[in-house]
Curated annotation (Swiss-Prot):
Matches recorded under NCBIfam families: GET3_arsA_TRC40 (TIGR00345)
Active site: D75
Species this chain originates from: Plasmodium falciparum (isolate 3D7)
Job of this protein: ATPase required for the post-translational delivery of tail-anchored (TA) proteins to the endoplasmic reticulum. Recognizes and selectively binds the transmembrane domain of TA proteins in the cytosol. This complex then targets to the endoplasmic reticulum by membrane-bound receptors, where the tail-anchored protein is released for insertion. This process is regulated by ATP binding and hydrolysis. ATP binding drives the homodimer towards the closed dimer state, facilitating recognition of newly synthesized TA membrane proteins. ATP hydrolysis is required for insertion.
Stored Pfam families: ArsA_ATPase
Comp. bias (Low complexity): 7-18
InterPro entries referenced in this protein's UniProt entry, alphabetically: Anion-transp_ATPase-like_dom, ATPase_ArsA/GET3, ATPase_ArsA/GET3_euk, P-loop_NTPase
Group of enzyme by EC: hydrolase
Descriptive protein name: ATPase ASNA1 homolog
UniProt keyword terms in alphabetical order: ATP-binding, Cytoplasm, Endoplasmic reticulum, Hydrolase, Nucleotide-binding, Transport
Gene Ontology terms: cellular component: GET complex; membrane
Gene3D superfamilies recorded: P-loop containing nucleotide triphosphate hydrolases
Binding site for ATP: K46, G47, G48, V49, G50, K51, T52, T53, E246, N273
GO biological process terms on file: monoatomic ion transport; tail-anchored membrane protein insertion into ER membrane
Length: 379
């Protein structure tokens, strides 16, 4: 990650813009969970970094404080069902053991069943798809528009989005700009061809169809503006970045934060998963053990303990190497973001996070402050 890239992160996404003072950069998610003004919380990052675990855990904590919570998966992989060991569909389903936490998994692939679906039997209706498809990605933007409009009308206190990997998520967040551009293009065409359209309306005796068409255009334009306003309101919407201390993940997190900055979308929390923390080492010196072994005459005992010491040294080397490697990227994360973000380091666990008990335990750890564990050789 270059210095120019690092310096390009805008202060507009910092804690200061969300009402936090310089002394409140806690290394936990308490302020996120306690912020009752938020309606939409997006959780995103590179694939395989623990987005679903993090979003599920955030939703569990929110369910303790909010009247109703919806966990909504837009990731085609739909790992939320696996996380809770419960099948979810495209309809809100109450999660087992909760009375106010729901989950749904939706397919964001383009469907013809959008608000812009037209009757292809009518002459003028055939023109619109050609115009729309001249904008790459407009079909996906239309689907996102319908999705976000339906979500906007849902009566939940807060919605947590378990998003797809970064590229797909950025397209979701960018759809208002693309849609407004395409619709603006159509509106301009209408103004330029107003006289011709009036002739066509008289010729086809189809005035209601023309008016209905542009009513749809104006409706979608207003809807896009409304959703974009929600995206850019830090009191209503925020983004939680999830990463692991590895090069590709840290680089993609930086790219994501820069894109969020450009779109004026609030982001003041970073969760770093799979972090190897220092161990509480026993007071044992391996060299002393070797010296003691040399005094033991029984060769069988010597062989057994020599093998044990050798394996212990190998494990220690792997552990230290891993700590040093992670510390390189944890140092970058700390230098880049510690002045503007809550950075929450979550430990590498021996078991996968599946089932309500494990998710609940993980969610509690998100609220516990932990120093960023930089290996001493990297200080």
């Amino acid at each position: 990650m270059s210095e120019d890239e690092s310096n390009s992160v805008s202060c507009s996404l910092s804690l200061e813009s969300d009402g936090y003072s310089d002394e409140e950069y806690d290394t936990n998610l308490n302020k996120l969970i306690e912020n009752e003004s938020l309606n939409w919380i997006f959780v995103g990052g590179k694939g395989g970094v623990g987005k679903t675990t993090t979003s599920c855990s955030i939703a569990v904590q929110l369910s303790k404080r909010r009247e109703s919570v919806l966990l909504l998966s837009t990731d085609p992989a739909h790992n939320t069902s696996d996380a809770f060991n419960q099948k979810f569909t495209n309809q809100p389903t109450l999660i087992n053991s909760f009375d106010n936490l729901y989950c749904m998994e939706i397919d964001t692939n383009y469907s013809e069943n959008t608000a812009f679906k037209l009757n292809k039997k009518e002459m003028f209706d055939n023109i619109l798809p050609e115009l729309l498809h001249s904008f790459p990605g407009i079909d996906e933007a239309l689907c996102f528009a319908e999705l976000m409009q339906s979500i906007k009308n849902m009566k939940y206190s807060v919605i947590v989005f378990d998003t797809a990997p970064t590229g797909h998520t950025l397209r979701l967040l960018a759809f208002p700009d693309l849609l407004k551009k395409a619709l603006g293009y159509l509106i301009n065409i209408r103004e330029k061809l107003k006289g011709t359209l009036n002739v066509l309306k008289n010729f086809t005796n189809n005035e209601m169809e023309f008016d209905s068409l542009y009513e749809k255009i104006n409706h979608l334009n207003a809807m896009s503006s409304s959703i974009q306003a929600n995206f850019q309101n830090p009191m209503k919407t925020t983004f939680v970045c999830v990463c692991i201390p590895e090069f590709l993940s840290v680089y993609e997190t930086e790219r994501l934060i820069q894109e969020l900055t450009k779109k004026n979308i609030s982001c003041y929390n970073i969760v770093v998963n799979q972090v190897v923390f220092p161990l509480d080492s026993p007071n044992v010196n391996l060299e002393n053990c070797k010296n003691l072994l040399s005094q033991i005459k029984n060769e069988q005992i010597q062989s057994y303990f020599n093998d044990l010491i050798s394996k212990t040294e190998e494990l220690e080397d792997v552990y230290i190497s891993r700590r040093k490697l992670q510390s390189k990227y944890l140092t970058q994360i700390k230098n880049l973001y510690s002045n503007d973000f809550h950075i929450v380091c979550m430990p590498q666990l021996k078991n996968e996070i599946r089932g309500l008990n494990n998710i609940s335990s993980f969610s509690e750890m998100l609220l516990q402050s932990k120093d960023i564990p930089i290996y001493k050789d990297n200080l």
